Every structure is written in structure tokens, then in C-alpha cells.
Amino acid sequence: MPILGILASSKLGKPVVTGGTLTSDATYYYRTFTANGTLGVTGSALTYDAIVIAGGGSGGHGEASASPVFNDYNGGGGAGGLLALTSQSGSGNLSIVVGAGGAARTGGSAVGANGTNSSLAANTATAGAGGSNGAGGSGGGGLGTYPDNFSTSGGAGTAGQGNNGGAGAATTSTASSGGGGGAGAVGSSAVTGNGGAGGAGSSTYSSWGSVTGTGQNVSGTYYYAGGGGGTGSSSAAAGGNGGGTAGVNTSSASSATANTGGGGGSTFSGSSSGAGGSGLVIVRYTKVQVD
């Protein structure tokens, strides 16, 4: 019986892997998915690591109203959750879903739209929250409004995937919104009319970005899943490294960078807030397994 088991195992041969865009370094192969797909493994089971990044939330849209009098500043979008997988074993067809970013908001006072989840087989990264729209992979930034002197805290991030958004701030004459959380840091809270910056994304997988050409390259370091910036009656704030975009007061905010999971920046009176960035899945495995 043991001899038969050895023979059966040897007939499987080394894993044969398909799917995604293939790149490599001296030690590893990387398969990158920027859209839904399948990681195919035939032969022996494959041992792999992976990062799964969900779609980021869009920034909120503000409004100034004369009757009744209010000035709403909604927050920056939270980054999509970044789920890291290590020493996984897989065979057959493993389904991959790459989440979309939340849609931009246009006109009126509106919280940002949540992104959508990304997944690899049964492993799911949680979508980023829209600005002032609560919890997510990373939380959205909080709201500030005057003359009501009302503000909200930032949304909570998902443990192990992201961070909290920053709080909004308000008095009877100023208001500002918080930055969305990022995979590497919490969003900054707003202070006295100044919007909070989006939280920084994660640079833990910078070497993966260098090989695959993904993430945001900042002076040679690659970041994923940065939060969107907030706005304020005095000033707006920057987005976080990792595809998050800045908040703006009187113009349209830019969309977060595609396939980073970044959060979109908020706007006060521009035509649209920044849409969230779509997600990403990268699978890495050793060359010695397959060559």
C-alpha cells in the first residue's frame, strides 16, 4: 500500500499553474489579477502566498444650503481591505473576484459609496467604506457640518485588513471632514476647518509591486490601499499613498488609482467626489515547485 501511494503521488507531477498575468523574480512567480478570473492548478497541489485587495470607497459630496442653513462636509473614502494569505495549499480551479471601487457622488449632500469585496477561493477582503458611510475594510472619514456644530467619528476598519477613518470636526462657524482609513494607517481627523488626510496604504508588499508593476510607486516604494482625503471650510487634505486621492473644496475630486483599492477624495461643492479604486489579487509561489 505505501508503494502504491508513492507511485500515485509521483504520477501527479509538479503543479501546472495558469491564469492572470505572469511575472517573476529570482525566486518567485507572480500571477496578477486585475479583473475576475481563475487560478488553475493541475498536477500536485500548489503552495502559495497571496494578497487580496478589495475595492475602495468613494469620497462623500458636500453641500451648502441657504434654507434651511447648513454646510455639510462629508468624508474621504476608506481603502479596500488588504488580506494577506501565507502558505496556502490549492489545486483545481480557484475562483478570483476583483472588487470594484465605489461610484463617485454628484450633487447634494451625500455619503460616499462603498466598494465591493474581493476574494480568492473562500478568502474575502472587505470592501472599503464610502466617506461618512461607516465601517469597511478601512473606514470612511467622518462628517462635519455647521452652524449645527455637529460631527461624526470615522468608520471602523476590519481587523487585520485596514484601519479606522478620521473624525469630522465642527463649530458654529466652521466644519471639516475626516480622511478615510488606509491599510497602513488610520485616517487623520479633521481640525478646525481643515480636512483630515487619508491614511497611508501598506508598503509591506512593495517588492511584489516592483515585480508586478502594481500599486502606487512613491520614490521606489510601492503602496497599496491608501485612504481618500477630507475637505474643510478652510482647507482640504491629501489622500494616502496607495492610490488614495485628495479631497477638494470647489472642484471635482480625482478618482482613486485603479487596482490599488485606494479611497476616493471628498468634495464640498465640486461636480463630483472621487470614485474608489478597484481591487487586486496577486498570487506568489516559488519557482522550485514548478520548474
Name every feature range the model reports, one short phrase each.
Residues 2-291:
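Low-complexity, glycine/proline-biased repetitive segments and flexible coils/loops
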